[in-house]
Structure formats: structure tokens, C-alpha cells
A protein has these predicted regions:
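Mid-domain alpha/beta scaffold segments of enzyme catalytic cores
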Residues: 1-221
Length: 221
């Protein structure tokens, strides 16, 4: 990656073990920073001891720049929604306490995500709606809570009409290009392992949507 134009990486934890690996990478490489948090897929392994550990790392480690990936995933409804709501709220509370922005995973859970963010004072810290997948009508709600919109390879897919419509109305200064490595590689590499070198394809598609040059996208994002 260092042979490309990528010079700084925020590696995002999702599982407890993933957070440990992310912290080790951030310690090993000066250009890698860490986001730590537990994804809804792993909420059944979460407890207050883990929350305390995450909080201590966020407070004491200057290379921890965000809390995430946290949120809700109702696509499979596992674990059950009550469990997801509990640990999303708890991790958001912790993020506000340590004053770190959040990286939000939200899949088919727009209303509950918005309610928790509003009730949890997420506007104080802001963050990113990772892999934004909701409508253009929801953009203003997240925007008003100081969130950025993560856009990656999905933007290049043929069935991405809803995301294209949202991208049209998201202000350029609130778009954050992301990889979601190793998933969701953009066309023409869809189905292959994704990495940050593929961001150029997202840039090209976004420039087409925004009717500007790729260079303008790079400068803005």
C-alpha cells in the first residue's frame, strides 16, 4: 500500500480479538491508527470487563482515534435486537465519556440507529456512518448530528441506485471514502479481496455523480 497514494490507515476493530490485533498494528506501524469497538455480530461476547478495557485503551493510547465498529445489524437479527440495542447504547455511552468519534455499522436498522444516536448525545462526538446504505431523505438527520458518510465499493455496483441518489445530496465535505477491506471491492474488481488501492474506482464513480473531476473528489475527501 505504501507504493500507492495511501499514506495513513485507520484500522477498524470489530471483534474483541480484532481490536487486540488493531492495537498491535497501530503500535507496530507509525502510519496506522486504531478504532476499537465491538460489532453487533460479537455482542454475545461483550461484557462490562471488555467495555472497561476498551475505555482504558481509548483514554491512555494516543493512537486510538475512534470507537468502532459499533451499531446495529437487523439483516439476520442475531443476536436478538434487545441485546444489540443494549450494547450499542453502552458503547456509545463509553465513546461520549472518552470523547472519541464513533464508527457506526447500521444495516436495516435506520430508525433505531437514529434514536440511539439522538438519545445518546452522539452529536457531541460525531463520527462516520460506515458503508452508508440508507435513503437520501435520511442524509439530513445524520448530517445534523455531525456525522460523515462512509462510501466505498458499493457505489460502483449496478444495483446501487439508492446509494447513488444519496451521494448526489451528501455535501462533499461530509463524504469519507472507505475500503471495508477485505469486503465489497468495487467494479471492476468486485468479488475479489478489497484493499485501499481500489479507492480510485470509487473516486471515479463519485466524480461522475458529482459532475466534477477526480482531483476535486480527492481534495474534498
Amino acid at each position: 500500500l505504501l507504493s500507492t497514494d495511501i499514506d495513513t490507515i485507520v484500522n477498524v476493530g470489530a471483534s474483541i480479538e480484532g481490536c487486540r490485533k488493531t492495537l498491535n498494528l497501530a503500535k507496530q506501524y507509525k502510519n496506522i491508527y486504531a478504532a476499537i469497538g465491538v460489532h453487533p455480530d460479537d455482542y454475545d461476547k461483550l461484557n462490562e470487563d471488555i467495555i472497561s478495557w476498551l475505555k482504558e485503551e481509548a483514554l491512555s493510547n494516543p493512537k486510538v482515534v475512534a470507537i468502532g465498529e459499533i451499531g446495529l445489524d437487523y439483516y439476520y437479527d442475531e443476536p436478538e435486537r434487545a441485546v444489540q440495542l443494549k450494547w450499542f447504547e453502552r458503547q456509545l455511552q463509553m465513546a461520549v465519556e472518552v470523547n472519541k468519534p464513533v464508527i457506526i455499522h447500521s444495516r436495516e436498522a435506520c430508525a433505531d440507529t437514529i434514536n440511539i444516536l439522538k438519545n445518546g448525545n452522539a452529536d457531541r462526538i460525531g463520527g462516520i456512518i460506515h458503508c452508508y446504505s440508507y435513503t437520501k431523505e435520511s442524509v439530513k438527520t445524520f448530517y445534523d448530528m455531525n456525522f460523515y458518510f462512509g462510501i466505498g465499493g458499493v457505489l460502483t455496483f449496478k444495483n446501487a441506485r439508492k446509494l447513488v441518489e444519496a451521494a448526489e445530496v451528501i455535501p462533499m465535505e461530509r463524504i469519507l471514502l472507505e475500503t471495508d477491506c477485505p469486503y465489497l471491492a468495487p467494479v471492476p474488481n468486485r468479488g475479489k479481496r478489497n484493499d485501499s488501492s481500489n479507492i480510485r474506482y470509487v473516486i471515479e464513480k463519485l466524480a461522475e455523480i458529482k459532475k466534477c473531476t477526480p482531483e476535486e473528489i480527492v481534495r474534498a475527501t
